[in-house]
């Protein structure tokens, strides 16, 4: 565990996420926003990396153990935003297919074949034969929930520009999950910065909203004063749990880069102004960029120093 870079706003650690987390003090982060390597998708060529476990159960347990430690590091009123994608069991080429041709570009042939065979056996042992959507996101979410995390939202990240897939016997994958967890029943959350702009309809008056023939209720006094009620919010409407955000390319980045708008939205809602955001899988630093843009401090962890170099450019 070593500090790779540090200034008054950013601290980057080089090392295994769990090992670094164990060295961090209690309550060091106000918010965690992260996207771990997906199960079985790609070999980044770094010993000890997440995502290369032989079975979903092993992957889920590593996630559970990591976030159990990070729960200590998170402030009592903090939130965890976890973006995680799914995988298919099988031998065919496709988006997030396990044991598929994508491994050819990621590892040596012998290593790839050995891992394929071990992973196939492990999947069959868990009663997940080829062609199955493994359901990794929900397996992880339920494991964290069983471990004491409070699952508040299962947000759909819809990708309007998702990459096409060469599959003909199922629909293309065009979304991923972003799970919102809290450590405690009462936590810091601000909906206003992420509200969607709303043009006031003609039946809005003084912050009150008309709904049919019902009388309205004054938000200030609680008294009925006509045919209006207080459901209209001048800051906009609740954005809901389906977020349509295009993917973006990051020159020189590793494969899994989510668009800055995604972590930025999580940070605005889930991290108090001036607070500290933590990403245990910092990668090319997208979460760090979002933290910087929103005036928060940042702690990033990655097992590959090359990604820290990329983030610092």
Where do the protein language model's features map onto the residues?
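Core catalytic lobe of class I
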Residues: 2-312
């Amino acid at each position: 565990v070593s500090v790779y870079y540090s200034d008054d706003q950013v601290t980057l650690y080089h090392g295994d996420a769990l090992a670094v987390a164990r060295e961090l003090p209690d309550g060091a982060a106000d918010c965690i926003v992260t996207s771990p390597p997906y199960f079985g998708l790609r070999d980044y060529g770094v010993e000890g990396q997440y995502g290369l476990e032989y079975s979903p159960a092993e992957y889920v347990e590593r996630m559970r153990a990591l976030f159990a430690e990070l729960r200590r590091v998170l402030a009592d009123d903090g939130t965890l935003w976890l973006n995680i994608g799914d995988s298919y069991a099988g031998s065919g080429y496709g988006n997030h297919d396990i044991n598929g041709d994508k491994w050819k570009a990621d590892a040596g042939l012998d290593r790839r074949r050995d891992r394929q065979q071990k992973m196939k056996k492990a999947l069959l042992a868990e009663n997940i034969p080829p062609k199955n959507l493994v359901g990794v996101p929900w397996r992880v979410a339920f494991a964290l929930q069983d471990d004491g995390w409070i699952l508040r939202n299962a947000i759909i990240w819809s990708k309007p520009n998702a990459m096409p897939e060469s599959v003909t016997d199922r629909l293309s994958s065009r979304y991923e999950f972003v799970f919102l967890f809290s450590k405690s029943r009462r936590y810091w959350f601000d909906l206003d910065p992420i509200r969607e702009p709303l043009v006031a309809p003609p039946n809005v008056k003084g912050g009150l909203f008309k709904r049919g023939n019902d009388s309205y209720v004054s938000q200030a006094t609680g008294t009925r004063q006509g045919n209006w009620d207080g459901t209209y919010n001048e800051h906009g409407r609740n954005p809901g749990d389906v977020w349509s955000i295009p993917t973006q390319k990051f020159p020189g980045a590793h494969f899994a880069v989510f668009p800055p708008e995604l972590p930025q939205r999580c940070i605005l809602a889930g991290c108090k102004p001036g607070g500290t955001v933590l990403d245990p899988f910092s990668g090319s630093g997208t979460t760090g960029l979002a933290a910087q843009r929103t005036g928060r401090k940042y702690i990033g962890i990655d097992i590959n120093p090359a990604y820290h170099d990329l983030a610092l450019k």
